[in-house]
Amino acid sequence: DAFEELGELTVHDRTTPEEVVARCAGCEVVFTNKVILNAEIIDLLPDLKYIGVLATGTNVIDLEHASQKGICVTNIPGYSTDSVVQHILAFMLHFSSMVSIHNDAVHQEDWVNSKDFCFTLGTLNELSGSTLGIIGLGTIGRKLARVADAMGMKIIAAHQSSMNRLELPYELEWLPVDEVFARADFLSLNCPLTPETDKVVNGERLQKMKTSAIIVNTGRGTLVD
């Protein structure tokens, strides 16, 4: 209702790339989540003054071109920090304890048919004492580090000059990015997608990693080659 008080509001649950221009024609304000507004589309929307990205990542918008056209672009940082951290932790617990594998085995009656009361299909690894490497120590990365610290993990992060003087309530070791790859038992990608971070995980860096290491990418897909 608050939006409708400001002007005419039209909501489209889903929009294909072919429908974007027609649906946005004449609009001064456009809100989007996954729908891409690139330079070509922006040029076809001369009335557009504001783009609101209903997410944290802004890679669906050509930010440089929007700025050149005088179009304001905003996003929603920090709205899902706890959810993302919980999701990362779920993956880490899943792989360290082989949750789904044991769940499937129990449902297939492997445990009741086992000769041993203690039923395991392999080594279960504790998170405590293992090393978590973080690429991107922004809001999500810092919250993840807090949780990992509470679980007894060693935390290392890729060196960021802007973070050097940041006082953190946990012990963290700053390292060159290649060394983070080499030392991590778990590697969490929490950086935005930029020209510098595109394919930050590549063949050369994968060769540096432990064969047992796990990569959890809750950022953009092309952070990984």
Predicted regions located by residue number:
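N-terminal glycine-/charge-rich "phosphate-binding" loop or analogous flexible N-terminal tail
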Residues: 1-27, 156
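Short beta->alpha connector loops at strand-helix junctions that form conserved
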Residues: 13, 54-55, 71-82, 159, ...
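Rossmann-like adenosine-cofactor binding region
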Residues: 35-42, 161-225
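Rossmann-fold NAD(P)-binding glycine/threonine-rich loop
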Residues: 59-71, 219-225
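Phosphate-binding beta-alpha-beta segment of Rossmann-like dinucleotide-binding domains, i.e.
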Residues: 69, 77-131
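Glycine-rich Rossmann-fold phosphate-binding loop(s) that bind the pyrophosphate
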Residues: 137-138
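N-terminal Rossmann-fold NAD(P) dinucleotide-binding loop
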Residues: 141-142
